[in-house]
Amino acid sequence: MKSFLVIGLGRFGASVAQELSALGQEVLALDIDAENVQYISDQVTQAIQGDAQDEAVLRSVGARNFD
């Protein structure tokens, strides 16, 4: 199993996150919009609200550790 970080949960990002999760992959989804995070939270391994343009946020989720 691989681990994926999906940044941005608009139509495309949410679809990617859902498909990866359905394929049995570990998915951390990140978006600045709380509604997008809430929508996807029960469909992925973890969903976090945060600004992906903030390096501290990316470090805190361990962005370098994903496939």
Which sequence ranges carry the predicted segments?
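Cytosolic regulatory regions of ion transport systems
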Residues: 1-67
